[in-house]
């Protein structure tokens, strides 16, 4: 059998192009705040982002002299220094306004405004407030800070989208990140979204339904393509019965009642969801089975293990996790992230 070996879709090029278009059309809004300027990966990424015109400007949180001196250690940054703003929370002119806002958000009896000032001066908290006030379009962090710190600050400060009850996350899996046999191309041009992989530990039916709806929206917003959502399980269409499968079935009914036009099905085993030959045998009438591009896992164990299996054994490129459900784009990086991964996450935050 002859196979076709070529790259049909480059996710990185696609996202970079979208980011550049946004920058061109929305210059004053196309900026990112990086609160972790002490990390050399963040500084290198900031330089690359500006040189590739993936953002109009960058805000770095820290002591101005320290940050500028660190930047100047990279010989290739002189041409973009004018597009970098270094902000020190301790000398920020609107710090009292930020403190007032943060205090109003806490809703804690007996807590004085001044007692919260140390928290507001924290780089992550301060950066989230900058996004809330519209000083920056997006906050990209997590290279140094834990996911718990990033998420807790975002939950306190960044409003949710209207109607959203829970925040969740998704991974973008690029299964065609290198030249491969395109006769076995999964998802949308080799791209699949996995959710939830990092936030909601054991979602109930309502939460699972919301994760599915949010992930479908994220897929459509990012790729401008039609989502086909599979609610995964160890069972396909009643092949096994347990409380775990009932949770998935209930989630399916909730989604269909809320958004009847969405292509979604469940419960589906993984092979039924993505392999057409298997889908033909197990669930021929399904409009999703065999061609799903958004995979919703029943719990965090399955989602987290699942994406890492695909990344390590299938050599897919894993981007994320990306938070969804917030009204502002927030990215929680892995502490093991590379410069390239920071650049990609930043471009994605600008493009949406």
Curated annotation (Swiss-Prot):
Enzyme class, first EC level, given as a word: transferase
Pathway: Metabolic intermediate biosynthesis; acetyl-CoA biosynthesis; acetyl-CoA from acetate: step 2/2
GO biological process: acetyl-CoA biosynthetic process
Protein's name in the database: Phosphate acetyltransferase
UniProt keyword Zinc present: no
A Pfam family it matches: PTA_PTB
GO CC aspect terms: cytoplasm
EC number in record: 2.3.1.8
Catalytic activity: acetyl-CoA + phosphate = acetyl phosphate + CoA
Keywords for the protein's UniProt record, in alphabetical order: Acyltransferase, Cytoplasm, Transferase
UniProt entry tagged with the keyword Acyltransferase: yes
Record's subcellular location: Cytoplasm
UniProt similarity note: Belongs to the phosphate acetyltransferase and butyryltransferase family.
InterPro entries, A to Z: P_Ac_Bu_trans, P_AcTrfase, P_AcTrfase_dom1, P_AcTrfase_dom2, Phos_Acetyltrans/Butyryltrans, PTA_PTB
Species name: Borreliella burgdorferi (strain ATCC 35210 / DSM 4680 / CIP 102532 / B31)
